């Protein structure tokens, strides 16, 4: 009887953790999509000049390559979290990739550059939080199933003896 009560309490705890994870994942995905939209709007407003990649200095091209590598790492890390977060991260990476070759960093106002850096940091933080939440729930599920097995074994042992 005690084992059944413990099992019911664990089921309630796992359901609460799953609901929390869904809420965190959906809010992270919607916030990421919103930030990507804001980043695209800011980029289109603050980039009046359309420059070709040939007119960019070498340092700007290498900065572009570094940003592409950063965006690629972020989107590949988000792939394991969930489909919605992967889509939002892809939108954010696409915004950064399509924004960079159009003008040099000199033509961007300082506030726009710092806003872009803050957006990348917040997207990375949300992806890390979602990943941590998913791992926490996964561990909780493992413990729940182990406890369920032990409770069933204890009930069976008590009934058999």
UniProtKB/Swiss-Prot annotation:
Induction trigger: Increases following spirochete infestation and decreases in response to engorgement, events that are temporally linked to B.burgdorferi entry into and egress from the vector.
Keywords: Cell membrane, Glycoprotein, Membrane
GO cellular component, one term: plasma membrane
Compartments in which it is found: Cell membrane
Tissues where the protein occurs: Specifically expressed in gut. Localizes predominantly in the intercellular spaces and luminal surface of the gut. In the gut, it localizes along tight junctions. Not expressed in salivary gland or hemolymph.
Major localization listed first in the record, in broad terms: membrane
Record PTM text: Glycosylated.
Function: Serves as a receptor for ospA protein of B.burgdorferi, the Lyme disease agent. Required for spirochetal colonization. Essential for pathogen adherence to the vector.
Subunit structure: Interacts with ospA protein from B.burgdorferi.
Protein name in the entry: Tick receptor for ospA
Gene it is expressed from: TROSPA
């Amino acid at each position: 009887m005690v084992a059944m009560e413990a099992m019911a309490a664990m089921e309630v705890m796992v359901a609460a953790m799953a609901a929390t994870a869904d809420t965190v994942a959906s809010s992270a995905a919607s916030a990421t999509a919103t930030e990507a939209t804001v980043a695209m709007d800011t980029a289109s407003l603050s980039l009046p000049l359309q420059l070709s990649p040939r007119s960019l200095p070498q340092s700007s091209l290498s900065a572009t390559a570094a940003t592409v590598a950063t965006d690629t790492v972020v989107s590949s890390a988000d792939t394991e979290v969930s489909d919605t977060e992967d889509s939002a991260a892809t939108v954010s990476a696409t915004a950064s990739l399509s924004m960079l070759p159009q003008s040099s960093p000199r033509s961007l106002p300082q506030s726009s550059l710092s806003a872009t850096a803050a957006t990348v940091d917040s997207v990375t933080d949300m992806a890390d939080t979602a990943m941590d939440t998913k791992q926490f729930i996964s561990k909780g599920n493992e413990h729940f199933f182990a406890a369920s097995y032990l409770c069933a074994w204890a009930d069976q042992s008590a009934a058999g003896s």
